[in-house]
Regions:
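Active-site region of the double-stranded beta-helix
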Residues: 8-108, 123-129, 137, 141-176
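Short, small-residue-biased leader/transition segments that mark boundaries at the very start
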Residues: 1-3
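Conserved SET/PR-domain catalytic core that frames the SAM/AdoMet-binding pocket
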Residues: 108-122
Length: 176
């Protein structure tokens, strides 16, 4: 038995000093590049100074899923510990994607998932442990203005094949 098998969600939150987050369960920013890109050095919509990249831990629980949102930046999800995470992506062309981020490579899960910038996405746990610990790396570095919460009704209408999943995940979000 691995020592991580004995961890609870509360242990992970405490040990990694994770704080509640409006979009991604519980979060702690772990890196923002000390090097930056000057204003005007990136394509639209990035019009201000940006770190080259950023990274954060995030933990998802049944009542703190990844809310329906998008960020301007490309991002890469990484699996670390706990349950797999079922991620729903809503692509600009009207198609959808469903990918499970987790440890079961033989079962088709991935330990990394690329999410293109401006892709609405949401996620929920699948599994028995009731928590997921992962990370997200982004480039350029994310600023609060880069994050947009999705309009559930509008996106459910545009993506009817996953509307039930979107509503189910949204219903589990803890009150702020």
């Amino acid at each position: 038995m691995c020592s991580s098998d004995l961890l609870t969600a509360e242990d992970v939150r405490r040990l990694l000093e994770l704080e509640p987050n409006a979009t991604c369960g519980f979060v702690r920013i772990t890196y923002a590049s000390g090097q930056s890109i000057a204003a005007g050095g990136l394509p639209v919509p990035f019009d201000d100074v940006r770190p080259l990249g950023s990274a954060l831990y995030f933990m998802v629980t049944p009542t703190a899923p990844v809310r329906l949102h998008r960020i301007r930046n490309d991002q890469l999800y990484h699996y670390y510990l706990g349950d797999p995470l079922e991620v729903f992506m809503l692509h600009k062309d009207g198609s959808t994607g469903r990918v499970v981020v987790g440890p079961d490579l033989r079962g088709g899960e991935r330990v990394q998932l690329f999410i293109p910038g401006n892709t609405f996405h949401t996620a929920r746990l699948i599994g028995r442990r009731r928590w997921f610990l992962g990370a997200s790396t982004e480039w350029p570095g994310v600023e609060p203005a880069d994050v947009e919460i999705g309009n559930l009704d509008a996106l459910a209408a545009k993506y009817p094949l996953v509307a039930g999943d979107l509503r189910s995940i949204a219903a589990s979000v803890r009150p702020n």
